[in-house]
């Protein structure tokens, strides 16, 4: 059963799922789609053409789906935000809608955990199981692969791609692409090691060992792209292939490796 506070504003055309809770002074715009068992807390604003998946939580004063901070944007353009299931969007987070430079939509996968004061700009593409710590800031068109963690107070430059399973340390600043399964740190960020904590949670020991050997082959000597080409030959690990293809396809370049002894 829906629970909607009398002071909440629900615009005509909004589609609300079963068991939705909308608290005092919240706003839900026209043409929104709110899934089942979604809670929109006091003062949160869900703007037009936003979709939020089942079992999600939008906390007080978060703003989802407002127009992009892009001077070329025209308000008559169709744009919005699509968020998957089980999302947590904490207080004062802002998620802007997309632009015609993308497909019109900012997209976030399932199980996102977006902490307070984070900003996700227009046309960002976030995979599943993403964590953004407080005040992480993503500029336009940033892409984050599945299982990526971005530490607090970290800005990411527009068009940067962060591969699957990465960890970006807090108070870093990214301006180049980060290879899957790596840990990056610093201002400007460099690649420091494998994200061993993350890959040990997901993969068995044999796969962790394969990724460790691949990391050493790629980063510790010679030319990075040549190393990636050579490593792809007769490569059986799909995860190692992801690392190699990412390196070969980067457009913003890969930051330098400044290693840690535990890589």
Swiss-Prot record:
Annotated PANTHER family: ACYL-[ACYL-CARRIER-PROTEIN]--UDP-N-ACETYLGLUCOSAMINE O-ACYLTRANSFERASE (PTHR43480), ACYL-[ACYL-CARRIER-PROTEIN]--UDP-N-ACETYLGLUCOSAMINE O-ACYLTRANSFERASE, MITOCHONDRIAL-RELATED (PTHR43480:SF1)
> Which InterPro entries did the record assign?
Acetyltransf_C (IPR029098), Acetyltransf_C_sf (IPR037157), Hexapep (IPR001451), Hexapep_transf_CS (IPR018357), Lipid_A_LpxA (IPR010137), Trimer_LpxA-like_sf (IPR011004)
Q: What HAMAP family does the record point to?
A: LpxA
Keyword annotations: Acyltransferase, Cytoplasm, Lipid A biosynthesis, Lipid biosynthesis, Lipid metabolism, Repeat, Transferase
* Chief place where the protein resides: cytoplasm
What is its EC class? transferase
| Listed NCBIfam families | lipid_A_lpxA, PRK05289.1
Name its species: Campylobacter jejuni subsp. jejuni serotype O:6 (strain 81116 / NCTC 11828)
Which protein family is named in the record?
Belongs to the transferase hexapeptide repeat family. LpxA subfamily.
Query: Could you name the Gene Ontology cellular component terms for this entry?
Result: cytoplasm; membrane
Note one Pfam family from the annotation.
Acetyltransf_11
BP GO annotations: lipid A biosynthetic process
What does the record give under GO molecular function?
A: acyl-[acyl-carrier-protein]-UDP-N-acetylglucosamine O-acyltransferase activity
Q: Which reaction does it catalyse?
A: a (3R)-hydroxyacyl-[ACP] + UDP-N-acetyl-alpha-D-glucosamine = a UDP-3-O-[(3R)-3-hydroxyacyl]-N-acetyl-alpha-D-glucosamine + holo-[ACP]
Superkingdom, natural source:
Bacteria
Where is the protein localized? Cytoplasm
Q: What is this protein called?
A: Acyl-[acyl-carrier-protein]--UDP-N-acetylglucosamine O-acyltransferase
Question: What SUPFAM superfamilies has UniProt attached to this entry?
Answer: Trimeric LpxA-like enzymes
Pathways per UniProt: Glycolipid biosynthesis; lipid IV(A) biosynthesis; lipid IV(A) from (3R)-3-hydroxytetradecanoyl-[acyl-carrier-protein] and UDP-N-acetyl-alpha-D-glucosamine: step 1/6
Physiological role: Involved in the biosynthesis of lipid A, a phosphorylated glycolipid that anchors the lipopolysaccharide to the outer membrane of the cell.
Question: Subunit details for this protein?
Answer: Homotrimer.
Entry EC no(s):
2.3.1.129
